[in-house]
Amino acid sequence: MTLQARNLTLARGGAPILTDVSLTLAPGTLVGLLGANGAGKSTLLAALAGELAPRSGQVFLGDADLATLNARQLARRRAVLPQKPSLSFDLGVSDVVGMGAYPFPELDPAAVRQLVRDALEQAGVTHLAQRRYPQLSGGEQQRVQFARVLAQCHAMHAPGQTRYLMLDEPISNLDPRHQMELLATARALAHEAGMGVLVIVHDINQAARWCDTLALLADGRLAALGPPADVLTPDHMRRVYGIEADVLAHPTLPGRLLVLAR
């Protein structure tokens, strides 16, 4: 069962944000969404998540139009990590991660506690479990929020049902080690757990290393879509980012690319 955007057009205040964009997120794949600032990446992710209604076009989860699903139904099928999660309450880290179980009231407290423990471990933040969320650094908060959506993903597991995870710039506050760990986890969720994962990143080389498919947006339109070798070309770097770049075979990772801006 795929999550598919078909010919999406979306505007805000009369200004076009997306124009005729089609994209498929399939089970078992990690799709990277790239583009310059203001290209429409977060808007496309929000539309795929069912959080924004397009002016025209549709988003389908299998045969179901996302517009026919309510918030609870959506939350039981896909998890979303926004670019800037808003949390104004002084909660403990475990409580924040436990919010991932909110769409599943049928879970008993013991099951929720196990979900939280598993998500904390998978996100590498078990050592933060007893801390207060507002006291954490920006990078620590980002990793805790990642644990929250991991808990949600684990809670939604049901035989025969594909789960989807959407991450909007999840590594923006992370150091290089934790960037790689988070993206490695995202790829494992796709390849090993069969999830469909969409991630917005600005680091082209991280996208080239971890993603199976890349979608490159430019001014609200899809400029390129396909495997990294087809998307990360000098011509695309010039047209989308306005930079001259060399695209080389990665010296230590077979089959991967390295993009070097001149």
Curated annotation (Swiss-Prot):
The keyword ATP-binding applies. Residues 3-244 form the ABC transporter domain. SMART domains: AAA. Gene3D superfamilies: P-loop containing nucleotide triphosphate hydrolases (3.40.50.300). Its main location: membrane. Disulfide bonds: none annotated. Keywords: ATP-binding, Cell inner membrane, Cell membrane, Membrane, Nucleotide-binding, Translocase, Transport. It is a peripheral membrane protein. Its EC number is 7.6.2.-. One of its GO terms (molecular function) is ATP hydrolysis activity. One of its GO terms (cellular component) is plasma membrane. It is found in: Cell inner membrane. ATP binds at residues 35-42. NCBIfam families: PRK13548.1. The complex is composed of two ATP-binding proteins (HmuV), two transmembrane proteins (HmuU) and a solute-binding protein (HmuT). Part of the ABC transporter complex HmuTUV involved in hemin import. Responsible for energy coupling to the transport system. Belongs to the ABC transporter superfamily. Heme (hemin) importer (TC 3.A.1.14.5) family. This is Hemin import ATP-binding protein HmuV. The lineage of its organism: Bacteria, Pseudomonadati, Pseudomonadota, Betaproteobacteria, Burkholderiales.
